[in-house]
Amino acid sequence: MSKDLISTDEYIKIKKKRKRIKKIVVLFIFLISILVTLCLKIPYFNIESIEIKGNVNIPKEIIKDSSTIKTGNNIFYTNKKDAIENISLNPYIEEVKITKKLPNKLEIYVKEREALFYNKVDKDFFIISKNGCLLEKRKEIKNMKLINLQGFEFNESKIGSALKAKDERGVKILNDFGVLLKNNASDVIFTQLDLRNLLDIRIYSNGICVKIGTSDQIEKKLNTAINILKRDELKKAKKGYVDVSYEGNPVFYIEK
């Protein structure tokens, strides 16, 4: 009998405890709901400033406008995914990150693609990034200091995408060259890269043809060629070649 009474008492206590917990949970949810509603409604969380970082050539206003985020919008309503997708539609944008700085600031960081190559098709210049992305078509390239590129299906390529090539290895080789040429700190200026034959790759410095051969050890071959091209007799040369395509001592020839 006493055991049954004790069990009943314990049951009542447990039931009361559960009711208290339930009330606390309901109250907590209610308070959270009020807090969320306030955050979404009060002006304290309205965006006051949008800071653009990382842009070099693309104006800040273009990035802001393409994001479709406006000052005055509630920071919690801001859809970062949509904004990133909108900004990334610009072919010159390689990467986008958006950070919310509570209570009312937004930071948009962009990494731009850099134009390095070009090819002329009919009256249009195709502008290409260092990693082989077609950035735009334009009518002139004055003062852009780009390298002429050969060996791709330019007319079949789409703006914002990698160049089309008959041999897919071409894009990878172009990317390798792009990194090396962008980091070239010497005074040697390259004017054309010919990837039409991947077994006989050639790069030109004005009238001097550098025979690279295959894509093996591109960095070593290019550095060797640069050191040769820095020699006085080659700086003055108008036509000739430097052959670094094979193992052993490189050969150069200056046309008289």
From Swiss-Prot:
Record key words, sorted: Cell cycle, Cell division, Cell membrane, Membrane, Transmembrane, Transmembrane helix
Record membrane topology: Single-pass type II membrane protein
GO terms under biological process: FtsZ-dependent cytokinesis
PANTHER family per UniProt: CELL DIVISION PROTEIN DIVIB, CELL DIVISION PROTEIN FTSQ
GN (gene name): divIB
Family membership noted in the UniProt record: Belongs to the FtsQ/DivIB family. DivIB subfamily.
Cytoplasmic topological domain: 1-23
GO cellular component entries: cell division site; plasma membrane
Segments in the Extracellular topological domain: 45-256
Subcellular location(s) of the protein: Cell membrane
Name of the protein described by the UniProt record: Cell division protein DivIB
Occurrences of domain POTRA (ranges): 45-113
Membrane-spanning intervals of the chain: 24-44
Domain of life from the UniProt record: Bacteria
One Pfam family named in its UniProt record: FtsQ_DivIB_C
General function of this protein: Cell division protein that may be involved in stabilizing or promoting the assembly of the division complex.
